Amino acid sequence: MSDQRSPLERALGQLEATLDQHLDDLAALVRIGGISAEPPPNPTLVRSAEAVVALMSRAGLHGARVLELEGAHPYAYAEWLGAPGAPTLLLYGHHDVQPVG
């Protein structure tokens, strides 16, 4: 039996099915407490980037790794190679938090 739902309905269904895990992942990232206002080197931002890389790997992205550049905060990097020629969506978000106040 094929799924007759629209792409949006399928996406919303997937979100509903995995929302608790996503919230747990987000809470874990916030608990790391990496603050980008603190200058590099910043060990908590490295831990935050490593946590994002682990999430990327779990999601099936390829080549997930932390990129560290001199004088800059770490970047979480990965590639999606699973569907050549398919539409691609990139969601960019900072993996740091801001200090209280």
Language model regions located:
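Acidic/His- and Gly-rich active-site-bordering loop/insert found
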Residues: 2-101
